[in-house]
């Protein structure tokens, strides 16, 4: 089983979109049992009192237009242990790469 985590700054737009689009692609190919896919943030800006904000409404709307459900997703921050837990950590941009290095 391949474990993949997409990472962006706040985990409310880009990385959740990548997570749910990839999950949809896997489902359409019948490969759900071969992958674990999730997403996280490098910051805590979208996490308040331990509770992450949901997917940003315009991002959720785009997913909904493609019949991709992201209900229940809330922002979470990447942890040092994720480097060992996941096979692939996929940052959305070069700033995410830099910020991810703080967790090593």
Walk through the language-model features, giving the residues of each.
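Conserved active-site segments centered on acidic
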Residues: 1-85
């Amino acid at each position: 089983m391949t474990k993949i985590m997409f990472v962006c700054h706040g985990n409310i737009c880009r990385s959740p979109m990548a997570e749910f689009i990839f999950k949809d692609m896997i489902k359409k190919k019948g490969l759900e049992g071969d992958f674990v896919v999730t997403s996280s943030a490098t910051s805590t800006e979208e996490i308040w009192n331990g509770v992450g904000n949901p997917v940003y409404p315009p991002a959720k709307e785009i997913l909904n237009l493609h019949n991709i459900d992201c209900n229940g997703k809330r922002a979470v921050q990447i942890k040092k242990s994720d480097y060992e837990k996941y096979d692939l950590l996929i940052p959305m941009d070069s700033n995410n790469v830099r910020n991810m290095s703080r967790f090593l």
